[in-house]
């Protein structure tokens, strides 16, 4: 069967060109790979020939998307432990150094530094030092535990010549709540809503979670895959554009904002939890705010919801993080089918160690103010229409989405960048007695640096 990019793929029944694609595609693109322990290495190339030999050697340490999917299936059946993940990405400068034809996405060609003004990012001079330098490649080494990652790191280092330098390094460390769901440092379930590219994953979502009646998570392959132009056969060899951004979270500041908002709105007792939910769009346990006024619907965390019953923003504010970055057909600027095309496969991981429980009832002063955050990672088929669109046109745009009364909701309170103003909230869930907060929600997430990469096919790496 040929590779049909216009729909989802059943990997178990894939044959012909579709099977070849899976055998030559890197893991973690179509389906997330476990990476509770993650090492990220940013590399520079000093000698093109040695860099090519190094990349060729890395291909021998990598597994295919198909192998990863088979490991996941085996783990479900027998609890068999899979192999660690090694992902490889190249920047436009890396391609130029290798003397190889690079993918043509204009944002990729320009690089992340060129997007600073567009995305309202901090100036490059304010980024952490290694992100200010020229980066040619990224390696992702991930697994459920630290041991396999250390072993894989040693194998990578054994292949690395002196002319391939480690420009910088990051370490990811997964966080989970008492229910075992992954959370970010503000304490909220993260990564629950994802575009699903595999038919088997869509079926599992329908049959084993809260369903797919109000929100269909399926997405066509063309939303994440592009032909690999430098591979031996781009009709069956595919890759994906990869965004990496280090986002530091000031947990203390965010928890102060939650406290102050609850005070401004006169929320009492357990209803004070709704203050944070109005910023995020979900309660800490993942319960969607548009679905109910209190936490508790978390087994499993729900994703089958829309904003059709909340068209006035009386339950979940229009500016809540998850409503801004996935309006679920309610944004008002585009037809729902066009709006969906901006969604991307997010593969982020938290970083930084802390001594407090993110979900404990503690005063803000006991929360970390720096050195923790999110290593934001996402796969795209079009950087300008997915990641950059989401950040610039949705999160940073005070006029999006479009409420019926024509008002401006304001920035995404979590990841929005730009001038902030006080925003409106419903002191009573589901009622139209809107009140305005006294002060703007402070920016508690700071971008510390990043880059754009292309994750090529295994066939390309072997051909070097």
From Swiss-Prot:
InterPro entries associated with the record: Dimeric_a/b-barrel (IPR011008), DyP_N (IPR049509), Dyp_peroxidase (IPR006314)
UniProt-annotated binding residues for Mn(2+): 258, 273, 284
Family to which this protein belongs: Belongs to the DyP-type peroxidase family.
Subunit structure: Exists both as a monomeric and oligomeric species in solution; the monomeric form contains no bound heme cofactor and is inactive.
Keyword tags: Heme, Iron, Manganese, Metal-binding, Oxidoreductase, Peroxidase, Secreted
Pfam families with a match to the protein in the record: DyP_N
UniProt cross-references to NCBIfam families, sorted A to Z: Dyp_perox_fam (TIGR01413)
GO cellular component, one term: cytosol
Source domain of life: Bacteria
Cofactor requirements of the protein: heme b; Mn(2+)
Binding-site positions, heme: 321
PROSITE patterns the record matches: DYP_PEROXIDASE
Catalytic activity of the protein: 1-(4-hydroxy-3-methoxyphenyl)-2-(2-methoxyphenoxy)propane-1,3-diol + H2O2 = guaiacol + vanillin + glycolaldehyde + H2O; 2 Mn(2+) + H2O2 + 2 H(+) = 2 Mn(3+) + 2 H2O; 2 a phenolic donor + H2O2 = 2 a phenolic radical donor + 2 H2O; Reactive Blue 5 + 2 H2O2 = 2,2'-disulfonyl azobenzene + 3-[(4-amino-6-chloro-1,3,5-triazin-2-yl)amino]benzenesulfonate + phthalate + 2 H2O + 2 H(+)
Active-site positions on this chain: 203 (proton acceptor)
Protein name: Multifunctional dye peroxidase DyP2
Gene Ontology terms, MF aspect: heme binding; lactoperoxidase activity; manganese ion binding; manganese peroxidase activity; peroxidase activity; reactive-black-5:hydrogen-peroxide oxidoreductase activity
